[in-house]
Design a protein with these regions (language model features):
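N-terminal export and membrane-targeting signals
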Residues: 1-13
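Solvent-exposed, non-transmembrane regions of membrane-associated and secreted proteins
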Residues: 12-128, 133-140, 145-197
């Protein structure tokens, strides 16, 4: 599976994504997994031709007041996923699908910094049904509706739910959350938002 090796590094990277202020909220149940796909459906969709979509350039989450440009995130020389250099700018993992292409497009953002709240500070409060817009370089926009938020210990990161291929477009927003471990300067949990068109 193409995404599994890269996805496994998320556990190490999420410590870098987070900084100082803990934002806590009661845990919510994980969203339902995507529907199972029979091998005949997978065969049909795997040969289906999907139109190429332009690169994502901006993320808008009206329910949170987020309206920010997107940066590209790749794989660092040590094999981990890069993290956004700017705490106010989320990053799209450009080794995965573009938002609107089949599969899970993944966008990472910081929860906070030593200076205060960052772009995904209130991500854990994003309600089911909220709309997330991704603007693309060609002027088009793809919108996703939140279907669930998962709070999970970094040691139990759900790699398959976040990165496993899907037949339809989907979006994952990932940040840190939960208790802050001062000895490691890292949050202990991840907040993952699952959204579909």
């Amino acid at each position: 599976m193409r995404w599994r090796p890269v996805a496994c590094v998320v556990l190490g990277v999420t410590a870098v994504v987070c900084s100082v202020i803990a934002a806590t909220a009661p845990p919510s149940p994980p969203p339902a997994p995507p529907p199972a796909v029979s091998s005949s459906e997978a065969s049909f969709h795997s040969v289906r031709s999907y139109a190429d979509v332009a690169e994502p350039v901006r993320l808008r989450i009206p329910a949170l007041g987020v309206d920010a440009p997107l940066t590209h995130l790749g794989v660092a020389p040590n094999g981990t996923i890069e993290v956004p250099a700017d705490f106010a700018v989320p990053g799209w993992f450009d080794q995965g699908p573009r938002p609107g292409q089949p599969g899970p497009a993944v966008i990472l953002g910081h929860v906070d910094s030593k200076a205060g709240p960052a772009v995904f500070y209130r991500l854990n409060r994003l309600p089911v049904g909220a709309v997330v817009f991704v603007d693309r370089a060609d002027g088009s926009t793809v919108d996703f509706r939140v279907r669930g938020t998962q709070h999970v210990a970094k040691t139990a990161f759900p790699t398959d739910l976040v990165y496993a291929p899907t037949l339809e477009p989907s979006l994952r927003l990932v940040t840190c959350g939960g208790p802050f471990d001062h000895s490691r300067s890292s949050y202990l949990d991840n907040v993952i938002v699952y959204a579909d068109p």
